[in-house]
């Protein structure tokens, strides 16, 4: 019998070794109460990952309960690997967003690559074929070498995995701000399509049913990855490089295809990806959802090397693995399938009726834990928050140089073209991509139909820091507008909540207020939350990131035919829809001129968002519009310049605003370009100019901005290239 040298239960207690795993004294005591004895080394490791912030949401769960999660189209909401929403004709869209922030800070290529791989497996575990990838990325300012290195590595990792596995990257966002120095945000989203009768759940039930492991052999990579993702980054974080998982997209592709075949077998009982906390979370969660027990015989787990202990097996986050429960007597059918795809697989245990999570190795018991308390009784913390205090600041915007300001904003990497990154992603694999990255939302045809899925992934930070409640509403509305801009009906959303240490009162209050705003917007815009992720402790040496909720939203296009002519032409009329107010607090103009965030009472009208959005969407479907863009960062001035640069053509517009108000970021506004001869009936729409002129010209109440189109386009397209040409 193999002997593993591990601390005893007494040594764990006396030396408080559980603290190194992320458990507090009170949490350790709760484990003792649940077990009725002191836990051994494997057991305390299991509790530490299952009760980590990453797996248990112990600081955010009360806020997540505010979100509306049901609707007439929602087939499956939070609690499974991903959300499932009906799109008609017995089909559904499956989607989720996940974070891989901490791993990407330490090992950017693998951190990003495994983030993509993990979210793909979440979608596949439901039984859906992935059709879209999206990503939301944030780094420190691109003038710094370290940020260039992180950016380069993350983009390469996303492309390296996504391109190999054969899923197009269709949309996303990339921003740069000093608040993300040392703590980049890497959020990945995947969207898939499934028939209703193929939807799977991660459940283990049926006494005696075998448990099958399939995928890469288990190694020591990623041990305590979930715990690592639940703590602040520090100078010691580099030593935790082994906590970063290693991806293998070629095995990932084979696993995806094998899984999609396995879900067609009626003998499949349940399936779940081995993601955060690996074999521990997948097996214990499946047992909990099935109201069953589970017994794993760990000597049967395929391992990469000899001598891997039960503790290491259970906490490893080796990638490209799935766990299945199948009907007793049919296991060989599944093993033969996986052998056909040249994947390692084995029966490693069985479902029991004991309600216990039991782990043995060659007959020796290494863990015996009640299932429900492990899965469902993680502590939940309700803390005292405190609103951040802002000094009263009244910045003077009266004497800006509009032309110089426009060029500076347009060429800042946050607002410049992201083609440097998108060109490294396969955008067309599968031949169903209709709208590629770079515009409001990605659009992908549903194969064999006239339908299409529009998807967007949007985050907000400076406004959430400025006013968390209103900022929370804004991030949901931004995603809604981006889907409206391609004529789709917004259906539902997934969220990724990226914040600092929730044990700090101001950050806890940011989380509380912003999620309240998000929940209100979800209700008003009829976009229920069907899946999501929380990433807390995003701090470096005690400095927190801006609170950054990220929203992934999907929309339905019933008939893609209108998209054939959805493009602007020379002579089309440009309309501005909305109104401009002197809203500068949290804006990119404020950042450019003063490099800070001043508190303002910026607000959003959700009722108006719905009315305006519906009107614009109907105009697109009716073929009256050639292009639509929601006005966002940089205001109407930057948005018009981006449109001109994207199409490399001039435009002329006259606006009843001051020079500074060209860059005000008043919420709810759009630029729409109407086709010649088409009547526009949108409340708040005003004709402001013409598309397709020789030069780029904006007139304000104070003067005129005139720019050479080629110069402007080169500045917009070349900004990130210029930063990345130096050796990184």
From Swiss-Prot:
Cellular-component GO terms for this entry: cytoplasm
Gene from which the chain derives: purL
Family named by the database record: Belongs to the FGAMS family.
Organism, scientific name: Macrococcus caseolyticus (strain JCSC5402) (Macrococcoides caseolyticum)
Enzyme class label: ligase
EC number(s) from the headed UniProt entry: 6.3.5.3
Catalytic activity: N(2)-formyl-N(1)-(5-phospho-beta-D-ribosyl)glycinamide + L-glutamine + ATP + H2O = 2-formamido-N(1)-(5-O-phospho-beta-D-ribosyl)acetamidine + L-glutamate + ADP + phosphate + H(+)
Annotated positions binding ATP: 57, 96, 495, 532
InterPro entries in the record: PRibForGlyAmidine_synth_PurL, PurL_linker, PurM-like_C_dom, PurM-like_C_sf, PurM-like_N, PurM-like_N_sf
UniProt-annotated binding residues for Mg(2+) 1: 98, 533
GO molecular function: ATP binding; magnesium ion binding; phosphoribosylformylglycinamidine synthase activity
Pfam families the UniProt entry points to: AIRS, AIRS_C, FGAR-AT_linker
Protein name as it appears in the record: Phosphoribosylformylglycinamidine synthase subunit PurL
């Amino acid at each position: 019998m193999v002997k593993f040298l591990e601390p005893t239960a007494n040594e764990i207690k006396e030396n408080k070794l559980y603290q190194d795993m992320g458990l507090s004294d009170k949490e350790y005591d709760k484990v003792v109460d649940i077990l009725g004895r002191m836990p051994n080394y494997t057991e305390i490791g299991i509790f530490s990952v299952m009760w980590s912030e990453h797996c248990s949401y112990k600081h955010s769960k009360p806020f997540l309960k505010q979100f509306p999660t049901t609707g007439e189209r929602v087939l499956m909401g939070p609690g499974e690997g991903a959300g499932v929403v009906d799109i008609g004709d017995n089909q559904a869209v499956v989607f989720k967003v996940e974070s891989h922030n901490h791993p990407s800070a330490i090992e950017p290529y693998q951190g990003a690559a495994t983030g993509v791989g993990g979210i793909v497996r979440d979608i596949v575990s439901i039984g859906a074929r992935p059709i879209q990838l999206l990503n939301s990325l944030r780094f420190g300012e691109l003038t710094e070498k370290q940020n260039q290195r992180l950016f380069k590595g993350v983009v390469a990792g996303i492309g390296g995995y996504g391109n190999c596995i054969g899923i197009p990257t269709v949309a996303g966002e990339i921003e740069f701000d000093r608040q993300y120095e040392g703590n980049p945000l890497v959020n990945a989203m995947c969207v898939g399509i499934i028939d209703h009768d193929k939807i799977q759940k991660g459940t283990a039930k049926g006494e005696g049913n075998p448990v099958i492991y399939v995928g890469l052999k288990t190694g020591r990579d990623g041990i305590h990855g979930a715990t690592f993702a639940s703590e602040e980054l520090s100078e010691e974080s580099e030593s935790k490089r082994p906590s970063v998982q290693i991806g293998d997209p070629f095995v990932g592709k084979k696993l995806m295809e094998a899984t999609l075949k396995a879900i067609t077998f009626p003998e499949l009982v349940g399936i779940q990806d081995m993601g955060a906390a690996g074999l521990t979370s997948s097996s214990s969660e499946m047992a909990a959802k099935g109201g069953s027990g589970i017994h794993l015989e760990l000597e049967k787990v395929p391992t990469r090397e000899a001598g891997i202990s039960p503790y290491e097996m259970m906490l490893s986050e080796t990638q490209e693995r799935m766990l299945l429960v199948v009907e007793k007597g049919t296991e060989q059918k599944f093993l033969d399938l996986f052998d056909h795809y040249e994947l390692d697989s084995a029966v490693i245990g069985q479902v029991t009726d004991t309600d216990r999570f039991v782990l043995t190795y060659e007959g020796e018991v290494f863990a015996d834990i009640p299932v429900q308390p492990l899965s469902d009784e993680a502590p939940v913390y309700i803390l005292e928050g405190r609103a951040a205090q802002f000094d009263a600041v009244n910045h003077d915007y009266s004497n800006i140089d509009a032309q110089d300001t426009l060029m500076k904003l347009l060429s800042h990497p946050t607002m410049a073209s992201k083609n440097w990154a998108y060109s490294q992603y396969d955008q067309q694999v599968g031949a169903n991509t209709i709208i590629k990255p770079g515009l409001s939302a990605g659009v992908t045809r549903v194969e064999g139909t006239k339908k299409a899925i529009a998807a967007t992934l949007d985050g907000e930070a400076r406004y959430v820091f400025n006013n968390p409640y209103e900022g929370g509403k804004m991030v949901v509305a931004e995603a809604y507008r981006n889907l409206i801009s391609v004529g789709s009906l917004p259906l539902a959303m997934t969220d990724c909540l990226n914040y600092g240490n929730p044990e700090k009162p101001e950050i806890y209050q940011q989380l509380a207020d912003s999620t309240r705003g998000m929940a209100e917007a979800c209700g008003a815009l009829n976009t229920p939350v069907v899946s999501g992720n929380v990433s807390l402790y995003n701090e470096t040496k005690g400095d927190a990131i801006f609170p950054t909720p990220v929203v992934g939203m999907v929309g339905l296009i019933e008939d893609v035919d209108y998209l054939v002519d959805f493009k602007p032409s020379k002579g089309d009329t440009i309309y501005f829809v909305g109104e401009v107010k002197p809203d500068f607090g949290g804006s990119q103009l404020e950042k450019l001129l003063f490099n800070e965030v001043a508190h303002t009472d910026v607000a959003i009208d959700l009722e108006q968002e719905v009315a305006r959005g519906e009107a614009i969407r109907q105009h697109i479907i009716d073929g009256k519009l050639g292009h639509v863009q929601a006005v966002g960062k940089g205001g109407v001035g930057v948005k018009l310049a981006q449109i001109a640069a994207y199409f490399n053509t001039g435009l002329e517009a006259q606006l009843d605003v001051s020079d500074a108000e060209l860059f005000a970021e008043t919420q709810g506004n759009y630029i729409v370009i109407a086709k010649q001869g088409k009547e526009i009936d949108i409340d708040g729409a005003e004709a402001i100019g013409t598309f397709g002129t020789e030069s780029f010209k904006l007139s304000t109440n104070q003067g005129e901005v005139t720019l050479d189109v080629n110069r402007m386009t080169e500045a917009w397209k070349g900004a990130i290239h210029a930063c990345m040409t130096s050796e990184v």
